[in-house]
Amino acid sequence: MRRQLGSDAGLTARMFLTMFLLAALYLFFLAVLWQAGVSYTGIIVFVAIMLGVQYYFSDRMVLWSMGAKEVSPREAPELHALVERLAALADLPKPRVAIVPTPMPNAFATGRNPANAVVAVTTGLMERLTPSELEAVLGHELTHVKNRDMTVLTLASFFATVASFIVQNFFYWGGAFGGGRDRDERNNIMLVYLASLVVWLVSYFLIRALSRYREFAADRGSAILTGSPGQLASALVKISGSMARIPTRDLRQAEAFNAFFIIPALNGNSIMELFSTHPSLERRLAYLRRLEQEMEERR
């Protein structure tokens, strides 16, 4: 039984909390820069410009990086029909549709808001899934669009990337141990480095935690839209099994986009789930089984 897809209160609360904590973290970093005597006006202007570019052009950047091609209803009528029907059920404007020519079975959604969203699937995904399974995967991606979690994740990840860049290039820029610097200057440089490290680490784990929860929320949304959690579970098993047979070299080329995929290109064991953008397959299947039982009880 299909039901109306509403907002996910749990995800909304977590997104607000994550953004609040990250904002506090970045204000702390600016305070450290001020304490160290660093003129951060230019840094703020540069970051603001890059953030604007990331916000407005993220969809084009992701599609270009993945080699995705937007397709018309004439080129992919069945795919467009599925997307259009699910978008109507989710009370969303129909997103643009793209296909990625790769044997790796996966799907993702991108775009700064529902009016500018793109849903993309790979040729490998369309070849492996039944129409019902494909519908369930598309329902998952459209739930991301509905929840607007793509935008929050993109903005949050941008600042974490800036902090990571500072940490990784610190010693290249001269480090705290270069010659010709007095003791206070070396201490200030080390202070900025340590603050960048803290910002990066805390941001990393906050974003990963939000990313894992949003996958559960999207799985739930797919179950509501299609009325069939079992079809999504079947699709996840097929995708995960197919990914295991793809050469690691090919998977690593797509690893940077793990947060956008329905299944990460590379996944670790359960011990490493804390570092993952997605919950483990086992946890997602167990969650979908619970949803199916709940839906059966309501029928």
UniProtKB/Swiss-Prot annotation:
Record-annotated active site: 141
Location in or out of the cell: Cell membrane
Any one Gene Ontology cellular component term annotated for this protein: plasma membrane
Swiss-Prot/TrEMBL cofactor(s): Zn(2+)
GO aspect biological process, one term: proteolysis
Membrane topology, from the record: Multi-pass membrane protein
Domain of life, per lineage: Bacteria
Keyword Hydrolase: yes
EC numbers, comma separated: 3.4.24.-
Sites where the protein binds Zn(2+): 140, 144, 215
Keywords recorded for this protein, A-Z: Cell membrane, Hydrolase, Membrane, Metal-binding, Metalloprotease, Protease, Transmembrane, Transmembrane helix, Zinc
TM stretches of this protein: 15-35, 37-57, 158-178, 187-207
Cofactor: how bound: Binds 1 zinc ion per subunit.
Gene3D superfamilies on file: Metalloproteases ('zincins'), catalytic domain
GO molecular function: metalloendopeptidase activity; zinc ion binding
Similarity comment: family membership: Belongs to the peptidase M48B family.
Name the record gives this protein: Protease HtpX homolog
Lineage: Bacteria, Bacillati, Bacillota, Clostridia, Moorellales
